[in-house]
């Protein structure tokens, strides 16, 4: 199954490369490329919108077809962007744009997800513990606390199977996984650069490592409100389940819990260390050339795989391999481990990363012209765009914008002085509002896919957004009133 999947991905990439190579080459200078990026027509964003519409609608109207032909839909929309882009700006720029997106962003993204998926799949829990409202609140609080220190993806992959297993007997449980995404996969990652990639990028641009702890009061407010709402929802659902005869098959609720495969925590720490190194090594002289550029393997044009990224990839893949080699396959069987979830995410996100390039180009070119000068504006605009685009470049665009406004006090970054309130707003917008959609942050879709595989009926793409509008947006309005006005 994995071999077939890899062949399909390589076929998709090969098709794009062959097209770009076969188009009459119109080599653009770096300056011209930047100018062209600023003039990208809005129509080139249509493939991105089309792919999102497929992700949202086809599982509802043609579920069987969608399951079999996701890779073809991704290839169609990707080529629908690449071909016109190559015709308009030359195959050289098209190939460079696609490679930069795949090597610079997608590769490390999917390798990190793959590593965490493998390691967490080798940790299992068994014992007499049933998912009651109090236990579920405790699990969500534990996962949220871990998110800032092992990353939202790490915490999500570590906690998702135990939460599902404890609530296997429940009939009404989709709300549990939705709040799991809200809290563990997003909001919990706001207290350190390890927590979420935008904060890691901020650290690489001069934001102090522990500065993110300034976000603690904001995070505590969000977590407290959402856990209170969750407890109320879960208690109602729990009582209905019990009234309908649903009961956990355990003799001593809340006791005798056993965790299998605990040695895999070593490999989890190894992956976290790889992520930290990817943020620290580029700033070291040993990894820079005379011009201060990060050293790496040049692939095409200005595209290169940096040595820090290569070290990160090797460390993560080694951790995944060691995890499989040292763990009994019986543990994976207990976890109902399959490759389906990671395959789905890998296929869909390769298309998302490629087709969202025009939107990111327009944002980078026009971001400073939006007239956004107040913290509350930064919070909402950064958050709204992070809900659908990659939150890391979105964060960097608005951090750059804030640094160019000429402030003389605040946090000293390599992009300029950024007032504390402005930086808090940008950080919270990028991290918190990744929870607004399934594609807003890396773990969201993984949690959905694993939940679906385990028989939990998760809401559709638009159905999930409705949950966000009802439960998250009011909390974000409260954030604005309390912290950003």
Task: Label every model-predicted segment.
Residues 25-31, 60-64, 82-105, 114-131, ...:
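Transmembrane alpha-helix boundary signature
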Residues 172, 191-192, 210-259, 432-485:
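Juxtamembrane and boundary regions of transmembrane helices in multi-pass small-molecule transporters
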Residues 1-29:
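N-terminal secretory/membrane targeting signals
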Residues 84-86, 147, 158-172, 176-178, ...:
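Membrane-interfacial helix-loop connectors
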Residues 270-405:
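Transmembrane helical segments that form the transport core of multi-pass membrane transport proteins
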Residues 43-55, 69-86, 106-115, 260-270, ...:
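Hydrophobic mid-bilayer segments of alpha-helices in multi-pass membrane transport proteins
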Residues 32-44, 65-74, 95-107, 209-218, ...:
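Interfacial loop-to-helix junctions that mark the boundaries of transmembrane helices
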Residues 212-326, 482:
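Core mid-bundle transmembrane helix pairs that form the ion/substrate translocation pathway
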């Amino acid at each position: 199954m994995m071999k077939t999947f890899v062949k399909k991905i390589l076929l998709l990439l090969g098709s794009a490369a062959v097209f770009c190579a076969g188009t009459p080459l119109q080599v653009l200078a770096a300056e011209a490329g930047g100018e062209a990026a600023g003039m990208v027509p809005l129509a080139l964003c249509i493939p991105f919108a089309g792919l999102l519409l497929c992700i949202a609608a086809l599982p509802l109207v043609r579920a069987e077809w969608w399951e079999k032909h996701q890779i073809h839909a991704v290839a169609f929309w990707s080529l629908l962007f690449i071909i016109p882009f190559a015709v308009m700006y030359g195959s050289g720029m098209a190939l460079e744009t696609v490679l930069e997106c795949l090597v610079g962003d997608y590769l490390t993204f999917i390798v990190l997800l793959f590593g965490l998926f493998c390691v967490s799949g080798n940790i299992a829990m068994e014992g007499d513990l049933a998912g009651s409202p109090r236990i579920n609140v405790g699990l969500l609080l534990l996962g949220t606390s871990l998110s800032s220190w092992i990353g939202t993806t790490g915490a999500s992959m570590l906690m998702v199977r135990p939460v599902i297993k404890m609530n296997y007997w429940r009939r009404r449980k989709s709300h549990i996984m939705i709040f799991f995404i809200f809290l563990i996969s997003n909001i919990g990652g706001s207290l350190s650069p390890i927590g979420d990639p935008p904060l890691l990028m901020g650290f690489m641009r001069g934001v102090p490592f522990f500065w993110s702890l300034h976000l603690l009061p904001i995070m505590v407010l969000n977590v407290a409100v959402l856990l209170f709402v969750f407890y109320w929802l879960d208690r109602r659902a729990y009582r209905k389940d019990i009234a309908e005869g649903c009961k956990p098959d355990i003799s001593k609720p809340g006791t005798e819990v056993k965790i299998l495969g605990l040695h895999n925590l070593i490999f989890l720490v190894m992956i976290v260390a790889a992520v930290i190194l990817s943020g620290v090594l580029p700033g070291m002289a040993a990894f820079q050339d005379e011009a201060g550029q990060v050293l790496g393997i040049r692939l095409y044009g200005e595209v290169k795989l940096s040595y820090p990224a290569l070290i990160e990839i090797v460390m993560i893949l080694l951790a995944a391999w060691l995890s499989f080699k040292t763990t009994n396959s019986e543990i994976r069987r207990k976890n109902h481990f399959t490759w389906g979830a990671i395959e789905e995410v890998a296929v869909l996100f390769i298309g998302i990363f490629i087709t969202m390039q025009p939107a990111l180009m327009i944002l980078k070119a026009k971001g400073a012209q939006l007239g956004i000068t107040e913290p509350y504006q930064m919070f909402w605009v950064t958050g709204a765009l992070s809900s659908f685009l990659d939150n890391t470049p979105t964060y960097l665009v608005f951090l750059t914008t804030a640094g160019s406004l000429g402030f003389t006090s605040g946090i000293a970054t390599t992009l300029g002085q950024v007032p504390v309130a402005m930086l808090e707003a940008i950080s919270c917008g990028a991290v918190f509002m990744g929870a607004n959609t399934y594609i807003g942050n890396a773990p969201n879709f993984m949690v959905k896919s694993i939940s679906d595989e385990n028989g939990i009926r998760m809401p559709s793409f638009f159905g999930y957004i409705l949950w966000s509008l009802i439960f998250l947006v009011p909390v974000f309005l409260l954030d604005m009133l309390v912290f950003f006005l």
